[in-house]
A protein has these predicted regions:
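Conserved small/polar residues in nucleotide/adenosyl-binding loops
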Residues: 98-102
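Domain-scale signature associated with acetyltransferase and cell-envelope carbohydrate enzymes
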Residues: 1-95
Length: 102
């Protein structure tokens, strides 16, 4: 099971039927929808602001999602795929999108 850690009184909330890789790290104010997959070596850092992830989202291996203190949250819409080793630092990604490295 993934490492899930409470920070500043916030505990991650994972939706129904989600896959969490054994070495994924999910910290703080993170909420996912249902049917998501969080793959190996992925880090979701909701330690200084919130991360909201829609339904059917796929966050692939090695990706890091990190918010900006008192500036920006992360919002990911439904059916988004975040490619391998992508860093998202305070952003809003609309539904049915794909992000990747070139």
């Amino acid at each position: 099971m993934a490492l899930m850690k409470s920070v500043r009184g916030f505990t991650p909330e994972i939706g129904e039927n989600c896959f969490l890789a054994d070495n994924a790290v999910i910290i703080g104010d993170v909420k996912t929808g249902r049917d998501c997959s969080i793959w190996f070596s992925t880090v979701l850092r909701g330690d200084v602001n919130s991360i909201r992830i829609g339904n059917g989202v796929n966050i692939q291996d090695g990706s890091v999602l990190h918010t900006l203190y008192e500036k920006s949250t992360i919002e990911i819409g439904d059916h988004v795929s975040v490619g391998h080793n992508v860093t998202i630092h305070g952003a809003c990604i609309k539904a049915v999108s794909y992000t990747h490295l070139r």
